[in-house]
């Protein structure tokens, strides 16, 4: 079920074809006009008690952070580190992974609520709410924009959800088959990105720490062989730049960087990024020559007084 809200979607005005083509051309769906300059902060605070997990950055120097506490969205200026709450959320909502498209629409994974929401990044207005699955027994975790759909992972069910990025179409549930074996009572599918050719998806399975290539026509998941690393356990957010894949391993406080082979059958470890400022980083986004990560601090008390931050490291 989809509920459309009063705020009009700019995608329905501009049409989905241009934005879909943009995503396929760039591979990451994000343009970079200028990069960070000297003096831009390398870390900055988020609101106390925000309980962040997801981050997304578009062509302009603004980062957007979802809240597990109330489903809100916070926008921070990368030039100053200052920000404001863009979307207030509401009691009982959660915002986990999120992605910003070219038209200024935020696609937001709703966690245990089983929904996906679309928020106008300019006004903070709620554009649409999509019911993906039941509100119990599921966890809608992360999202990637690919072609004319936003694809969401479900950590508790072997299925992906394709939400149409326009006025027409229905939500598509794509069961994962092939090499995929769903494990009970743990987080399975987590971070997701498109393949370099734009025809499929790469999904990280947090437990036991594996990467998969998914065929969007059939749902067949093929395990990607790792070279130089035994696993990517606690794999959370993914970022792909060309054939370079960044895997955020949250509780291990590191980002592992792999090179993908042309067929996306093998991932070779090239380096590991660590930083003393990491405090259970969950997801990452790029702006210029920096990688911005959000510290979810899962190992600390999650209270209204808990402090949170975002940090930047060189790519």
Feature map (PLM): residue ranges:
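Hydrophobic alpha-helical segments and helix pairs
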Residues: 124-173
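Conserved beta-strand positions in repeat-built beta-propeller and related beta-rich domains
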Residues: 64-69, 106-113, 151-157, 195-196, ...
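A short beta-strand motif characteristic of beta-propeller blades
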Residues: 40-45, 82-88, 127-132, 172-174, ...
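Blade-level signature of beta-propeller repeat domains, shared across WD40, Kelch, NHL, RCC1
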Residues: 290-315
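Short loop/turn segments that connect beta-strands within beta-propeller blades
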Residues: 77-81, 121-124, 165-167, 215-219, ...
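N-terminal secretory signal peptides
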Residues: 1-8, 19-26, 32
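C-terminal segment of N-terminal export signals and the immediately downstream linker at the start
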Residues: 27-45, 54-56
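Beta-rich, blade/repeat-based domains predominating
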Residues: 47-63, 90-106, 133-151, 179-200, ...
